[in-house]
A protein has these predicted regions:
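Preference for long, amphipathic alpha-helical scaffolds in soluble/luminal domains
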Residues: 1-216
Length: 216
């Protein structure tokens, strides 16, 4: 137990502390070299590193860039190739918006560019941040796009005229005690994403309440 038995009656959240301790123990196990999880992790990274990376694509695109960059496994040559091909794709698209229907395209690319230390405000002469300057456009794809847009802006402390609206929208559009991609039941995946997006603003009372609700 995280709290000695003699002190448990003095601690109101001992159960929560116990659960957190158990989860940290699981994380420590995963991080140990030689465990199956670590082996799988290394295998996946190796596969991603060997495969081609294509710009403005979900699978085999930006998520690969982000994963490899964060793991320190993205070679300079592969990073440069991705960036150059992305610039060509943005130029060919001819707009700050990478998709008429999916604002998550802009958000995902911005996150990937931040992992490379690149400025999304000028990619082949186009401002990918401006592609997310309209709440109607962002919300047309649902709460998922709102969450990823906020995360994207915060990857490099970008300023955005939709910033406060994004935070408010996430807080005001909870499903039960969390968030859901669809339906009336909160799901773990989207709730975790929402909490990640809101975490930098936990000092705000309303945001903090939403975060703690999701954690429950």
């Amino acid at each position: 137990s995280a709290v000695p038995e003699r002190l448990r009656d003095k601690v109101t959240n001992s159960d929560t502390l116990d659960k957190a301790t158990e989860r940290f123990a699981v994380i420590d196990t995963i991080k140990q070299a030689g465990t199956k999880s670590k082996d799988h992790f290394d295998t996946v990274l190796g596969t991603l590193a060997d495969n081609n990376i294509y710009p403005v694509q979900s699978i085999g695109g930006e998520w690969s860039v982000i994963a490899l960059a964060r793991a320190g496994k993205l070679s300079a040559d592969k990073a440069a190739k991705y960036y150059n091909e992305l610039c060509e794709a943005v130029k060919a698209n001819g707009s700050d918006r990478l998709s008429d229907r999916k604002p998550t395209e802009n958000a995902r690319v911005i996150i990937a560019l931040s992992s490379l230390g690149k400025n999304s405000a000028d990619i082949a002469g186009y401002n990918l941040l401006s592609g997310l300057d309209d709440m109607d456009y962002i919300t047309s794809q649902g709460i998922n796009a709102v969450i990823f847009s906020l995360i994207a802006f915060d990857t490099t402390d970008y300023s955005a005229n939709t910033h406060d609206e994004l935070i408010a929208y996430i807080v005001d559009n909870m499903t039960g005690k969390g968030w859901a991609l669809a339906g009336d039941t909160a799901d773990v995946d989207l709730t975790a994403m929402a909490i990640q997006a809101l975490a930098p603003y936990a000092a705000d009372e309303k945001v903090n309440a939403a975060i703690h609700s999701g954690l429950e």
